């Protein structure tokens, strides 16, 4: 065999060695946990044959605690580029079979390389996390490695989409990188995220809690809002990541892919003419409205299990990807609170950063009252949603279905926040407050006098409520002053949104020159 062929054989052997990660036994352990390896995940996510791997032969440089004898090619992370549905993406996947996926200086360098390239190429970045944390043997170098990654997360924010998949443990400082990305997906039962683990919590606070209840997927999907999606299986999780990518652009200079539309834009949905209940305090399901107006009724929801009183997610109108923000009357009457405001604000800001038009479906009676809300800074969080809508320069269309009261009316894409098109259904009630509250305030003195005179106060207040409703509980007062562009028939909503988006396709808007705003935090 010639020297050249011998070298090629050596290359092939090294590649095979690198592909084994921590070895066959470690791979089997990973499979026994019900988890795929880093390479298997990358192969599932990317188009077949498209993966271009970087730094396959890179090794760590640590000589402490006998680490020089524990070398594995690639050092615990698979990194490179590939395509998903033909679109370029950059990806890294931590390999739990190598030193439990712990982050070393070398791993950080590999991750930072694909992050830098993603920025240069204007392509989405996907990180699959499955790591025991920092590699303790490397000391401060491991911490510096995390910091290098975080800095790039920050610089890439608003420039390229960043998506994190939590497919195993993610603890300590490692949690900050997913927190800095745009979307996070967690695997149910096999992944968790927390700053301090159960043992530390027990030692410091005396609280006895397991990993799942401290930082499992269910906790972060329903209570903290840290994760945007959860999946029961890794196959399902991979498919969700692919679906998400189909709705968003590759970078902040582009728009999302337009899909062929087979659903007529002028399709009338007669059911919408009767979806609003006669009783103004009766709930209805906003999901039915969304399904009735979007292309083929499809909707990809973001954070479906968190703050259910507001709905956010992606849909298409005439093939164009759009962000939807909608109050949900079937949950807490659709009121805004701390979590709903936070959820809505983050989504609106993502849409604005990546050129996704925003369609708002409004039925909101106000902000949730109470000390629990005030003590948890509902003022600041409500201001975040207000700020997000106000700074957004993408096309914005608001449709008011029923209630739109007080400060919540302003916050939910009002005309004064430079919303381009504001429509209202005939059932819309745009006012400072509802009739019962308004009558109680406006006629307090008269009601008191009638009570002292022994007259029927309830009948008096009911009469005044009817008068208030006649005057304000309709869209025409707002339309009279130009705060509503048109009152539309509910069944015609899809067509009006599609036509409005086409009209706004060439919109150009700008903000005053500044380094950056100071959003209420």
Where are these regions (language model features)?
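Ligand-binding clefts of soluble mixed alpha/beta catalytic domains
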Residues: 1-521
